[in-house]
């Protein structure tokens, strides 16, 4: 069963803090135009996206796209997808700042058996599915850009390319 969870964002929090106080001669008018009280803002991209429940829902939706895509689905044909989803969630929790450590394999080691068959075409397909998933879940473009920068930072390791 597919869960529907709306990913939340930090944007309303930021807007409330950035509203300018307009100059006024009246204290009442100044109070009326003062910024809304700042509320506690999430401190990580993981929190901005909605935390555990929202990221788990995104991982589920993401892997539904992966297994339906012939470009990349063959890499998961002998994979226990429940375990894979759990690993992906744990990695994203770490990579997006929701967990302080990663206990899994490094990206180069985790993907080494797929190389040389794994290419940039596959990496881009996976990245596109994640971006599409975040878009469908209502994540603002700024947050998608941040999340995709995290994904892009793993490219060299995932594809087992020489380090620069």
From Swiss-Prot:
In this chain, heme is annotated as bound at 63, 111
**CDD domains cross-referenced by the UniProt entry:** TrHb
Q: How is the cofactor bound?
A: Binds 1 heme group per subunit.
Q: What induces it?
A: By light.
Q: What broad class describes the main subcellular location of this protein?
A: plastid
Checking PROSITE patterns in the record gives: GLOBIN_FAM_2
SUPFAM superfamilies in UniProt: Globin-like
Pfam families of this UniProt entry?
A: Bac_globin
Q: Molecular function terms in GO for this entry?
A: heme binding; metal ion binding; oxygen binding; oxygen carrier activity
The UniProt similarity line reads:
Belongs to the truncated hemoglobin family. Group I subfamily.
Q: What is this protein called?
A: Group 1 truncated hemoglobin LI637
Listed GO cellular component terms?
Answer: chloroplast
Quaternary structure, from the entry: Monomer.
Q: Where is the transit peptide?
A: 1-22
Q: Result of mutating residue 63 to L?
A: Changes iron coordination
């Amino acid at each position: 069963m597919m869960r529907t969870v709306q990913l939340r964002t930090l944007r309303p929090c930021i807007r409330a803090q950035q509203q300018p106080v307009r100059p006024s001669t009246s204290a009442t008018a100044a109070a009326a135009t003062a910024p809304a009280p700042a509320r506690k803002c999430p401190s990580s991209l993981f929190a901005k996206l909605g935390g555990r429940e929202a990221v788990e829902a995104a991982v589920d939706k993401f892997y539904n796209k992966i297994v339906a895509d012939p470009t990349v689905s063959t890499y998961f044909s002998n994979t226990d997808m429940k375990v894979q989803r759990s690993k992906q969630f744990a990695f994203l929790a770490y990579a997006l700042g929701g967990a302080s450590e990663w206990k899994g394999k490094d990206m180069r080691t985790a993907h080494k058996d797929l190389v040389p068959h794994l290419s940039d075409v596959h990496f881009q397909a996976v990245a596109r599915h994640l971006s599409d998933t975040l878009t469908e879940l209502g994540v603002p473009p700024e947050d998608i850009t941040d999340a995709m920068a995290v994904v892009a930072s793993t490219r060299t390791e995932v594809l087992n390319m020489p380090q620069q």
